[in-house]
Amino acid sequence: MIAWRLPLCVLLVAAVESHLGALGPKNVSQKDAEFERTYADDVNSELVNIYTFNHTVTRNRTEGVRVSVNVLNKQKGAPLLFVVRQKEAVVSFQVPLILRGLYQRKYLYQKVERTLCQPPTKNESEIQFFYVDVSTLSPVNTTYQLRVNRVDNFVLRTGELFTFNTTAAQPQYFKYEFPDGVDSVIVKVTSKKAFPCSVISIQDVLCPVYDLDNNVAFIGMYQTMTKKAAITVQRKDFPSNSFYVVVVVKTEDQACGGSLPFYPFVEDEPVDQGHRQKTLSVLVSQAVTSEAYVGGMLFCLGIFLSFYLLTVLLACWENWRQRKKTLLVAIDRACPESGHPRVLADSFPGSAPYEGYNYGSFENGSGSTDGLVESTGSGDLSYSYQDRSFDPVGARPRLDSMSSVEEDDYDTLTDIDSDKNVIRTKQYLCVADLARKDKRVLRKKYQIYFWNIATIAVFYALPVVQLVITYQTVVNVTGNQDICYYNFLCAHPLGNLSAFNNILSNLGYILLGLLFLLIILQREINHNRALLRNDLYALECGIPKHFGLFYAMGTALMMEGLLSACYHVCPNYTNFQFDTSFMYMIAGLCMLKLYQKRHPDINASAYSAYACLAIVIFFSVLGVVFGKGNTAFWIVFSVIHIISTLLLSTQLYYMGRWKLDSGIFRRILHVLYTDCIRQCSGPLYTDRMVLLVMGNIINWSLAAYGLIMRPNDFASYLLAIGICNLLLYFAFYIIMKLRSGERIKLIPLLCIVCTSVVWGFALFFFFQGLSTWQKTPAESREHNRDCILLDFFDDHDIWHFLSSIAMFGSFLVLLTLDDDLDTVQRDKIYVF
């Protein structure tokens, strides 16, 4: 059995040797080589050249070695293969080097340089050998040049700027060792020109080093770069207390926002990219210390806790002032029957006998508007309270009856004999005309705003938190820092968070939102106590006190802080709506609160209000996903925007006393015929018409701007629409308040002035634009800037500080704006 197998084995061995002899080289040329010397040799399929190098490696001294190769023959199909064999690593590359780009495009490089990874040594000094093997399958001679150099400045030093050149086929990397006492550094790389696009990578000191465009993303942290790049590196992430800074030029510029180069139509024809060289400078500087973290947190807490202290001091002062005032009134006007001062009907100046339920009318006490129209025609209409006589409050029936507080009672007027269509369509209305419903009914109605937004907040925030944690985990695991748009020059990590300072600065929204809730709670407690003791000022005077919307506003401010912090965990275009969703809520709630002040009975319900805000957020998401450059989307949105503006204008103008049904067009034509064609009559509600005309002009202009310009940041565009409408309504409210003879007390006036100033500074810092996800990550980093406050906070953090204070101040303005009316009867307070 063995006898016949032996000849077969001999034949197989002979065949293999014959095959290897046919494929393998005939000659091997080995020579000792020296550093800093250029070797020009030839190689073909019959010859392999081996160069032997040796150098002394010292344990406490790191030295870089760089191999440079240039193939002089431009031939296709048979590249040269260079293999560098070291003690613990092997590096191989072909020349011409072919790297692939987008759509598998091929780019050819005749000159290649690679830095060798130095293996560590345990001895004080050691002579190490490495070999460079050169081979090819080309049957003809191929001429090449080989040179091995020692790299000067291979080890980067803290605070020293180093400049170098690199290309896609000549990547560079350098070593940095953490000095004693330094736990964190920031690696800054800059260039005077944006292109060619490059990649900055931070890798552990291991072999091999991934320093080509097609493998640089395999390990470590990396980010694309045009003119700026910055990566914060912590000692705890590198057990060897050192790392490599790798710089690679990409084959194409599309990742950095550039255009694709011309590509030949010949299939598989590589493009020579030898001209893509970039000059860069690298600087490693110490990052902030733990003391800076503590100082930043104490500063942030100190600023906002000072508002708590100021609020307590103001509350104590106001309490002392009220006690003093009450004591003086008690001395001057003590009532012997009750033994303590109490506001009576005749204590209101200018009161007249009560004449039934038409207390919203003027002068004659009737429900007719003839007198008003007549006065208007003569130009003698006055907006001051002193020129009108009103009914006494004491003789008026209580509006907070013990009737049912079911949902069906929300839109009933059982406490009057007049039809609400008559009351609400009078030419001139007073707050008493629109504050006729049961107080408990309205309280329940407006409390729904708070409970609904609390529910929305929970269901919205939990998935958001989960998602941004996933984003941060992906960044930490993959090392791809292009996922998140930080200000990398001022991004201070803490734990797993990459930019803790941007998250910390959102604390103001939460703390000031909570403070606003506490202020509202105190006001509500005081108001309820006044109601319990039948204080007629609380019962019959001033703007009706409903606190549900204020609670909703405070909750929205807190949620804005939470969601803004979530957005800044990993800011990018896919989660920007997290940062803006509750801004829409705040803008909408503020407008509703302004409207509720003078229209408590007919304000929108929480369900319809939040449904409208949900539609806004829905369009925000659609705009982010589909709106960029999509003409059809912008046409549809602009049409919906204009139609919604017209419908809302009609609702506000007619105080809800109109119907959207099949007869709407017939009624419109009838109004146009009677008021414009038969006789030219002006609008019945002039003030409302002025506001709505201005609002329509602004909204139509914004719709036209969006349709023509089609801004990339749709979420901010949508927010701008809400803010413009809020500012317009707020300005109209203040103007009409002053025009009606009312005044603004000192505290709200100070709030208005201070808030306006703070908003101005806040917007200045907001428009600094430290990053933008409307561009590529590399282009966004061109806007990055160093910290400007305590070496810990950047411009956007200051925007967070100031905008939270400004929002809090704006809420206080809404809360205190009508405090001057607390002693004015509601049938003397105009509706506008």
From Swiss-Prot:
Indicate the principal place this protein occupies in or around the cell.
membrane
Top-level taxon of the source organism? Eukaryota
Q: How is it modified after translation?
A: Glycosylated.
Glycosylated residues, per the record, are 27, 54, 60, 123, 141, 165, 476, 496, 572, 603
Ranges facing Cytoplasmic side: 315-447, 521-546, 627-631, 710-715, 768-796
Alphabetical keyword list: Cell membrane, DNA-binding, Glycoprotein, Lysosome, Membrane, Phosphoprotein, RNA-binding, Signal, Transmembrane, Transmembrane helix, Transport
* Secretion signal span: 1-15
Q: Has keyword Iron? A: no
Which Gene Ontology BP terms does the record give? cell morphogenesis; glucose homeostasis; regulation of insulin secretion involved in cellular response to glucose stimulus; response to glucose; RNA catabolic process; RNA transport; type B pancreatic cell development; type B pancreatic cell proliferation
According to the UniProt entry, its GO molecular function terms are: AP-1 adaptor complex binding; AP-2 adaptor complex binding; DNA binding; double-stranded RNA binding; nucleic acid transmembrane transporter activity; RNA transmembrane transporter activity
Expression by tissue, per the entry, reads: Highly expressed in the liver, brain, kidney and intestine (at protein level).
Q: Which PANTHER family match?
A: SID1 TRANSMEMBRANE FAMILY MEMBER 2, SID1 TRANSMEMBRANE FAMILY MEMEBER
Name the record gives this protein:
SID1 transmembrane family member 2
What's the source species for this entry? Answer: Rattus norvegicus
The gene designation is Sidt2
